[in-house]
A protein has these predicted regions:
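Short aromatic-rich membrane-water interface segments that cap or initiate transmembrane helices
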Residues: 162-174
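Hydrophobic core segments of transmembrane alpha-helices in multi-pass, intramembrane catalytic enzymes
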Residues: 41-51, 96-110, 175-191, 232-234
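N-terminal signal-anchor transmembrane segment
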Residues: 1-59, 79-88
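Aromatic-anchored transmembrane helix interface
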Residues: 70-79, 91-115, 127, 131
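Alpha-helical transmembrane segments of multi-pass inner-membrane proteins
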Residues: 126-156, 172-234
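Juxtamembrane "helix-exit" motif on the non-cytosolic side of transmembrane helices
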Residues: 82-92, 149-152
Length: 234
């Protein structure tokens, strides 16, 4: 009986599209952190395999493709992509096939999440926004503190705190820092909206987010955004 329960829990874990989306986005975030880039990309390989299998599972159980909004245009896009790959067959065919599978996965699991029964985007948005707020605040505090004490170094691809007189902090390059800072500020805006948080409180029995964290996130990300001098963030 215990083995059966374990298999059911394992099946429930790997068939949870919502959980997959949260883990996938969080892992994509870690690919931008210089010190965590390699393990994050390694994990991304396993997440890709999980995502492709989950897309097949959702199609079999939820009939995802035929419930997609504008599904006929998505199908046409994928068909043209396959046709183009075949008529331009080359040494990069395997790479193109992997990219095609990734596109299919994104269509089914991200764009197609509206086809899932009892789906509520607010819960996922809340968890992802909260993670980004906490993670970027901690990363920015580390980076800004090291910058203030003049601690910086270069090692292979890592340009810690400063790269070409631009602030990088813990990230891979200043442009990524700028982009993530903008996303973090937007996440703070979401988490500070009263009606959104009230809807979340109705479904998740956990304490709200401290305003200290929101203010710290806004302040450190605004400061980092200025120091990174990133045109891409505009």
């Amino acid at each position: 009986i215990q083995m059966t329960d374990f298999k059911q829990k394992l099946r429930g874990f790997f068939s949870d599209s919502s959980l997959f989306r949260r883990i996938y986005i969080i892992d994509l975030f870690f690919t931008n952190i210089a010190f965590l880039q390699i393990p994050a990309y390694v994990l991304l390989v396993f997440l890709f395999i999980w995502g492709v299998c989950l897309s097949v599972y959702n199609q079999r159980h939820n009939n995802t493709f035929f419930k997609l909004r504008f599904g006929i245009w998505i199908g046409a896009f994928l068909a043209v992509t396959v046709f183009t790959m075949l008529i331009n067959f080359s040494q990069t065919f395997l790479y193109s096939l992997l990219m095609l599978l990734h596109v299919v996965m994104c269509f089914f699991l991200f764009y197609g999440m509206h086809t899932e029964p009892e789906f509520d985007y607010r819960i996922e948005l809340y968890h992802i926004a909260k993670f980004i707020m906490y993670a970027t605040t901690v990363m920015n505090i580390i980076g800004i503190t090291c910058l203030m004490f003049g601690f910086k170094f270069e090692w292979y691809w890592i340009k810690f705190t400063v790269y070409e007189n631009r602030f990088t902090g813990c990230y891979d390059n200043p442009n990524l820092l700028g982009f993530i800072s903008v996303v973090s500020i937007f996440c703070c805006h979401i988490l500070s909206k009263g009606h959104f948080m009230r809807r979340i409180a109705e479904k998740i029995p956990e304490p709200g987010i401290s305003k200290i964290w929101i203010v710290a996130c806004l302040a450190t990300n605004a400061f980092s955004l200025i120091l990174c001098d990133s045109n891409a963030s505009l």
